[in-house]
Curated annotation (Swiss-Prot):
InterPro entries: PA_dom_sf, PA_domain, PRADC1-like_PA. It comes from Drosophila melanogaster (Fruit fly). One of its GO terms (cellular component) is extracellular region. This is PRADC1-like protein. It comes from the Eukaryota. CDD domains: PA_hPAP21_like (cd02127). Coiled coil: none annotated. It is found in: Secreted. Its main location: secreted. Glycans are attached at N179. The keyword Phosphoprotein does not apply.
Length: 196
């Protein structure tokens, strides 16, 4: 009889635990987690909302909303030397490849060319960082940037760059930052190639 009671108690205990599982839905705040978003308005092939990881300890915050500004691929792509397409970049947002020099140096080059912000991305698909966000940190120099900078997933950067080149476009048009605070996660127009 004691064994029967123990079996019954164990069964009830398991069923109570199973029925008291708490399900917490994922909110937009969980997704945002301090990141910044921008949307591409044109060309239509790129009309999605993209996520950036802001620079950790240099540059300014993405506090001013920029609407309909050009997103321009820098020349040279890594922006470690003087930017040659400053005329196209002036008043826009720089799209810069990672590597060869510090994130701060790239941001300072973009700022000197008249950019209002810098977006840095991994361009090498075989890099271990290609599908991850990178914490962009200060290079411990005596300099600092006065424009915001953020890191874009490599896959997004490669697709944006290749689409603009295929369409022979100098730039895309973007809004940055985009406030998603009250947008349900299912309504965020994320790029289909990411699957989040």
């Amino acid at each position: 009889m004691l064994i029967a009671w123990l079996v019954l108690a164990a069964t009830l205990s398991r069923s109570i635990r199973a029925s008291t599982t708490i399900s917490i839905p994922i909110t937009t705040q969980d997704i945002i987690a301090g990141d910044v978003f921008f949307e591409i308005l044109s060309p239509s092939e790129l009309e999605y909302t993209y996520r950036l990881r802001p620079a950790k300890d240099f540059g300014s915050a993405f506090s001013e909303r920029l609407e309909g500004v050009p997103l321009v691929i820098t020349d040279p792509p890594g922006a470690c030397q003087e930017i040659r397409n400053a005329r196209d970049l002036n008043g826009g947002v720089a799209l810069i490849d990672r590597g060869e020099c510090s994130f701060l140096t790239k941001t300072l080059r973009a700022e000197a060319a008249g950019a209002l912000a810098a977006i840095i991305t991994e361009y090498n698909p075989s890099s271990p960082e290609f599908e991850h966000y990178i914490e962009m940190i200060h290079d411990n120099s005596q300099q600092d940037a006065n424009i915001p900078a953020g890191f874009l997933l490599g896959k997004n950067g490669v697709i944006i760059r290749s689409t603009l080149q295929r369409l022979k476009r100098v730039h895309a048009l973007i809004n940055i930052p985009v406030n998603l605070t009250f947008t349900p996660p299912s309504k965020i127009n994320h790029p289909p190639w990411l699957g989040w």
